[in-house]
Amino acid sequence: MAKANVSPGMQQYLDIKKNYPDAFLLFRMGDFYELFYEDAVKAAQILEIGLTSRNKNADNPIPMAGVPYHSVQQYIDVLIDLGHKVAIAEQMEDPKQAVGVVKREVVQVITPGTAVDSSRPDSPNNFLVAVDFDGKAYGLSYMDVSTGEFFATDLADFASVKSEIQNLKAREVLLGFELSEEEQAILVKQMNLLLSFETTALEDSPLIDHQLTAVELSAAGKLLHYVHQTQLRELSHLQTLVHYDIKDYLQMSYATKSSLDLLENARTGKKHGSLYWLLDETKTAMGMRLLRAWIDRPLVTSEAILERQEIIQVFLNAFIERTDLSDSLKGVYDIERLSSRVSFGKANPKDLLQLGHTLAKVPYIKAVLEAFNSPYLDKLVNQIDTLPELEHLIRSAIDPDAPATINEGNIIRTGFDERLDHYRKVMREGTGWIADIETKERQASGISNLKIDYNKKDGYYFHVTNSNLGMVPDHFFRKATLKNSERYGTAELAKIEGQMLEAREESSSLEYDIFMRIRAQVETYIDRLQQLAKALATVDVLQSLAVVAEKNHYVRPLFNQESRIAIDNGRHAVVEKVLGVQEYIPNSISFGPQTSIQLITGPNMSGKSTYMRQLALTVIMAQIGSFVAAESASLPLFDAIFTRIGAADDLISGQSTFMVEMMEANHAIKRATPHSLILFDELGRGTATYDGMALAQSIIEYIHDRVGAKTMFATHYHELTELSTKLTKLVNVHVATLEKDGNVTFLHKIAEGPADKSYGIHVARIAGLPEDLLARADAVLTKLEAQSQARESVLSTTEVRETQQLANQQLSLFTDDGSSSEIIKRLESVDVMNLTPIQAMTVLYELKKLL
C-alpha cells in the first residue's frame, strides 16, 4: 500500500497498515483515533462520521475520518457487530518528549470472536472457534476470551461441526484446512460467520493437555496462536483447556433448540418466552451465563443430575436462608470478566472497587451456605475461597470515590503510601503556606498592598507597585519588571513553590505507578478468582432453579431404567408462565416400556404441538437438574432429542419446506437410538397428499421396527391411525373437542384413540375468514365427503367382482411371452398384508417395467 510523497507520519501509518490489510486501523493521534485512505471512506459510511481529508490543497488529498479517544469503544462495537476486524495503534511515547515522529504500535486486534468490551453486563459468552481436519476426524476448539474458558472436542463429520458452531453461536471461525467454496458459503452466508484461515499452531502451551487427540491439539494450538497474535500480550486469565465429548450431554441440533425456544423465542429473537427466561432468577452475570450453558447442554448421567436436585431440595426446604442467599448474591459483580480486564491490562479503579466489593460479600455468602447445614453443599462451600488478603489490599489501597480513569488522580486511599500522602499534604496545605508567607512579609515590610500572585512564566511572586519599591526588603530578588510594578521572589517562597510543583507532578505519576503495582498484584490471584467465580455461579443457578420451582409449584422428577414415561398432569412450563396457571390445561403423558410411538391426531390450534413440546421441555428441565411442571414425573434418561415442529423454507440455501422436513427426518432416524426422543409434527405435508402419507407411514414403521426411540408423531393423515392394528408399540391419542349446536370447543386435553374429524373449517372461522366463504367451504366439504364415500363403495364392489372373475379365468388368457410368468412370480412374492405405501409404489413401478 505504498503511496508517493507522503509525510513521515503517514509513512508510519502505511507501514503499520500493510501488516493488517483486513482490519480497520485506528491510528492514535492526540485525542483522536484517525482512519485514512480506504478505511476512512468505508468507516465514514458505516459509522456515520464526517469524511474529510489530510493536505486538502494537495493534488491527491488523503481521505481521513476520526473519532474521539474517549468514545472509541462504541465505534469499535459497531464495526465488530458488522463482522469487521479493528486494529488499534497507540502512541508508545509522550508526544512532548518524542524526537521526530511519535512511536506507534498496534497493541490489539479486535475481531468478532475476540471482542471483550461490552456495554451489557448480562451479555452471553462470545466464543471464538477453531476447526481442523486430519482426513478422518475434525478437531474443534473454542474459547471465550472475555472469560478465559477454553474447550476442545473431536467430531466425526462436518455436519456435526456445523451443528456445534451453531450451538455455540460463534461469530468467528478459524479454519486450519482447505474447505470447499460451497461449504465456505454455508458458513459465511447461512451462519453469518467471519472466516479466517490459521495454519500456525502454538505448541507446548501449559494450557493444553497433550492427552488430547492430534486433531484436537492442532485446533486448540491454532486457536491459541490466533489469540496471541491478535491480543499481543500474555493473557493470564486463559484457563486450562477442558476436553469434552458431545455424547456426555443431551444432544440437540440448533434447529431443535430453536423450535423449543430454549434460549430465545424463535419468533421474536428475544429472551422473553424462552425456557431461559422462565428459569432465570439468577442474581449475577456469571450465573446467567452458566444457566444458559446448562440449558444448552443438559446432562445424561443420573449421578450429576441427582446432585443438583439434592441441592435444589435443600434450598427449597429453607426459605429464610435461601432468601438471604439470593439477596447476598445481588451485590456480586462479574468476577470472570473483571479478571479478564485485569489480565488485558484494562482494569480501572472502578473495576477493582467492584472486585473488592464482591470479595467483601463472599464470607457472608459462605456463612449462609454453611447455615443450611447440608452435606450436599459441602463441596460448594469448600470451593468458595474468601481471599481475605486480596480484599484487604483493594479496600486499603483504592479510594472508594476513585474515578473510572487512571490518569485523573485521587485513586489511592490516604494512608496507603507515605510518599503520596506527603505530596497530597503539600498540595493541600501549600496554598495555606503561601498565604502565611504573604501575611508575614506584608507585616514585616510595611507594604500594605503586598500580595502573592502566580502565572506559568514566573511562577509564584510578590507583586510590588512602583510607589512601594523603596520598601522592598533586602532578601527579595527581582523576577520581572513591568511598567507600573515589579515582581519579586524570596528563597522561602521558591522553596514552597518547588515543593508544590514537585507534589503536583510527582503525585500523579506516583499514583499511577502504585495503581499499576496493585493491579499486577491482583493479577496473581486470577486462578483463585476464576475458581471462586465458578462456585458462586453454580450456587446462583441452583438457587434460581429453587426459586422457580417454588414459585411455579414444580415437582422433583424421578428417573427410571424401564424406558417408561409417566407424567401426571404435566404442563408446558413456558406457556403456563405466559398464560397464567388458571388458564393452562395440564395433560398427562404416558409411555409404557413397550410403547415407542404416540400417533397424535386432532385439529389445528387444538394443542398438539404444545403437548409435544411439553414433553421435550420436561425432559430438558429434568436433565439439567431442575424440578418440572407436573404433579409427578418419572422419566428415562434420554441421550438426544430430535424435532421437526413448525414449517419454514430455507430461503438462503433454496431448500423447500418439504426438503428441510426430509433432511431433518433423515437426521433423526439415522442418529436416534432407543434412548432418544423424536418429535415430528405434520411430517410429509409439504408434498402431494399420497406421497406425504406414504412417506409418513414409512417413517413411522421405520422408527417402530428399527430405531425404537420414544416418538410423538402428530399428523392430519387420519388413515395412519390404522397402523395401531399392526404396529404393537404404537398407540393413538387425540386432542379432545366438544361439538354442540354447530359450535366446536377445543378442550386442549389429550385422550386415547384417534380423532374423528379435523375441524379445519372451524379453525378458519376462528381466524376470521368471511362467512360466505366458509359457507361455500362447508358445501364443498359435504359434496367431497359424499363423493369419497360413493367412490369407496364402488371401488369395494368392483374389487370383489374383479377378484371373483380373476379366480375363474385360465392362465392361458395371458399372452405367453415369458413376461407373464415373471409378473406372476413377483405378485406371489408380495406380502400384501404388510406392504407399506412407499413399498407398494415401488412394486408397481417394477411391474410396469415388466410389461
Swiss-Prot record:
<dbReference type="Pfam" id="PF00488">
    <property type="entry name" value="MutS_V"/>
</dbReference>
<dbReference type="InterPro" id="IPR027417">
    <property type="entry name" value="P-loop_NTPase"/>
</dbReference>
<dbReference type="Pfam" id="PF05190">
    <property type="entry name" value="MutS_IV"/>
</dbReference>
<feature type="binding site">
    <location>
        <begin position="602"/>
        <end position="609"/>
    </location>
    <ligand>
        <name>ATP</name>
    </ligand>
</feature>
<keyword id="KW-0234">DNA repair</keyword>
<keyword id="KW-0238">DNA-binding</keyword>
<dbReference type="GO" id="GO:0030983">
    <property type="term" value="F:mismatched DNA binding"/>
</dbReference>
<comment type="similarity">
    <text>Belongs to the DNA mismatch repair MutS family.</text>
</comment>
<dbReference type="Pfam" id="PF01624">
    <property type="entry name" value="MutS_I"/>
</dbReference>
<dbReference type="GO" id="GO:0005524">
    <property type="term" value="F:ATP binding"/>
</dbReference>
<dbReference type="InterPro" id="IPR007695">
    <property type="entry name" value="DNA_mismatch_repair_MutS-lik_N"/>
</dbReference>
<keyword id="KW-0227">DNA damage</keyword>
<comment type="function">
    <text>This protein is involved in the repair of mismatches in DNA. It is possible that it carries out the mismatch recognition step. This protein has a weak ATPase activity.</text>
</comment>
<dbReference type="InterPro" id="IPR000432">
    <property type="entry name" value="DNA_mismatch_repair_MutS_C"/>
</dbReference>
<keyword id="KW-0547">Nucleotide-binding</keyword>
<protein>
    <recommendedName>
        <fullName>DNA mismatch repair protein MutS</fullName>
    </recommendedName>
</protein>
<dbReference type="InterPro" id="IPR045076">
    <property type="entry name" value="MutS"/>
</dbReference>
<dbReference type="InterPro" id="IPR036678">
    <property type="entry name" value="MutS_con_dom_sf"/>
</dbReference>
<dbReference type="GO" id="GO:0005829">
    <property type="term" value="C:cytosol"/>
</dbReference>
<dbReference type="InterPro" id="IPR007860">
    <property type="entry name" value="DNA_mmatch_repair_MutS_con_dom"/>
</dbReference>
<dbReference type="GO" id="GO:0003684">
    <property type="term" value="F:damaged DNA binding"/>
</dbReference>
<dbReference type="GO" id="GO:0140664">
    <property type="term" value="F:ATP-dependent DNA damage sensor activity"/>
</dbReference>
<dbReference type="InterPro" id="IPR007861">
    <property type="entry name" value="DNA_mismatch_repair_MutS_clamp"/>
</dbReference>
<dbReference type="InterPro" id="IPR036187">
    <property type="entry name" value="DNA_mismatch_repair_MutS_sf"/>
</dbReference>
<dbReference type="Pfam" id="PF05188">
    <property type="entry name" value="MutS_II"/>
</dbReference>
<dbReference type="InterPro" id="IPR007696">
    <property type="entry name" value="DNA_mismatch_repair_MutS_core"/>
</dbReference>
<dbReference type="InterPro" id="IPR017261">
    <property type="entry name" value="DNA_mismatch_repair_MutS/MSH"/>
</dbReference>
<dbReference type="GO" id="GO:0006298">
    <property type="term" value="P:mismatch repair"/>
</dbReference>
<dbReference type="Pfam" id="PF05192">
    <property type="entry name" value="MutS_III"/>
</dbReference>
<dbReference type="InterPro" id="IPR005748">
    <property type="entry name" value="DNA_mismatch_repair_MutS"/>
</dbReference>
<dbReference type="InterPro" id="IPR016151">
    <property type="entry name" value="DNA_mismatch_repair_MutS_N"/>
</dbReference>
<keyword id="KW-0067">ATP-binding</keyword>
